[in-house]
UniProtKB/Swiss-Prot annotation:
Its main location: membrane. Its cofactor is FMN. FMN binds at A61, G62, L63, D64, K65, T85, N138, N171, K216, T244, G267, G296, Y317, S318. Pathway: Pyrimidine metabolism; UMP biosynthesis via de novo pathway; orotate from (S)-dihydroorotate (quinone route): step 1/1. CDD domains: DHOD_2_like. Disulfide bonds: none annotated. SUPFAM superfamilies: FMN-linked oxidoreductases. It is found in: Cell membrane. Belongs to the dihydroorotate dehydrogenase family. Type 2 subfamily. It comes from Marinomonas sp. (strain MWYL1). It catalyses: (S)-dihydroorotate + a quinone = orotate + a quinol. Monomer. This is Dihydroorotate dehydrogenase (quinone). The lineage of its organism: Bacteria, Pseudomonadati, Pseudomonadota, Gammaproteobacteria, Oceanospirillales. PROSITE patterns: DHODEHASE_1, DHODEHASE_2.
Length: 346
């Protein structure tokens, strides 16, 4: 069924088909049809960051930027859904065209530029729904905000969403906002994260609820850089690391007509790089921080590979575009079987 729908959607401009799909999913929620979307399978829950996830497979940020369809997306079987990236003020993002499919590689290039309707709109969307699942909110900075002042944007977003999110992700690794990736390193990273951790702790002290803070990092780093980032995040007291965002590398798609398009490359070409980052993190952190693995998952085996490398949870996005809900089912079944075998010592 999805393959037929995909063949029709892929005849449209990528961004048009994206918006159409979200509109249809949002309509499913409005009409009370989500119960027909499949629902959560019976699986062993996974406890990470102090939260209980129904299963280990989540939807990565970027698909539902404005929390338009998170209820329906959750009803497809995801163990958790991450909305955003959201910024303090709404912004249009980069000029179009800015989204490109590479079907031969099951890949996508995007240079969207954090297009979203702003944090107040996103909060209003979340407040107007009763979502029973685990909901993450991915936060970023506005294009007009300097890198030096970025912490204020992240803090404004965190303080707005923390009453409504199950966890929050600071996106410091999108390649489509100039200078953003420089925040991953050294004192810049510490200065960005420290006020977010302090705000998380203030909220917990005031309301008795800890909302975990994760940080999403890029795949385009050396092993030493990955370790330095990890050390800083541990020192600052974050709750998790999401590895990874899209890559700037085009090595895997050389010769493709979109090879020279600017933006981040996601999908199968980033799989090995993201898995490598997960492995380096896991070996270095030694269970100090949980890792959520994302990048190039297009099968159940790919999802398990991330867990074997050291991730506790996984997220999918591009693979979902190419394979639809069947990938969710396959990844959930495979990761659940993996965890059950670990429990049995098989």
């Amino acid at each position: 069924m999805y393959q037929l729908a995909r063949s029709l959607l892929f005849k449209l401009d990528p961004e048009v088909s994206h918006e159409l799909s979200l509109d249809l999913l949002a309509a499913s929620s409005r009409l009370g049809l989500n119960r027909f979307l499949g629902g959560l399978p019976s699986t062993k829950p996974v406890d990470v960051m102090g939260l209980r996830f129904p299963n280990a497979v989540g939807l990565a940020a970027g698909l539902d930027k404005n929390a338009d369809a998170f209820e329906a997306l959750g009803a497809l079987g995801f163990g958790f859904v991450e909305v955003g990236t959201v910024t303090p003020k709404g912004q249009a993002g980069n000029p179009k065209p800015r989204l490109f499919r590479l079907p031969e590689h099951e890949a996508i290039i995007n240079r969207m530029g954090f297009n979203n309707k702003g944090v107040d709109h996103l909060v209003s969307r979340i407040k107007s729904h009763r979502y029973p699942g685990v909901l993450g909110v991915n936060i970023g900075k506005n294009l007009t905000t300097s890198v030096e002042d970025a912490a204020a944007d992240y803090l404004a977003c965190l303080e707005s969403v923390i009453p409504y999110a199950d966890y929050i992700t600071a996106n410091i690794s999108s390649p489509n906002t100039p200078g953003l990736r420089s925040l991953q390193f050294g004192e810049s990273l510490a200065q960005l994260i420290a006020p977010l951790v302090a705000a998380r702790d203030r909220y917990e002290a005031a309301y008795g609820k800890r909302v975990p803070l994760a940080v999403k990092i890029a795949p385009d780093m050396t092993d030493d850089e990955i370790k330095m980032v990890a050390d800083t995040l541990v020192d600052q007291g974050v709750d998790g690391i999401i590895a990874t965002n899209t890559t700037l590398s085009r090595e895997a798609v050389l010769g493709h007509q979109f090879e020279k398009e600017a933006g981040g490359l996601s999908g199968m070409p980033v799989r090995d790089a993201s898995t490598h980052v997960v492995k380096v993190l896991a070996e270095h952190l030694k269970d100090t921080l949980p890792i959520i693995g994302v990048g190039g998952i297009s099968s159940g085996a790919d999802a398990v590979e991330k867990l074997q490398a050291g991730a506790r949870l996984v997220q999918i996005y591009s693979g979902f575009i190419y394979h639809g809900p069947e990938l969710i089912k396959e990844a959930v079944a495979s990761t659940d079987a993996y965890y059950r075998e670990l429990d049995l010592g098989i």
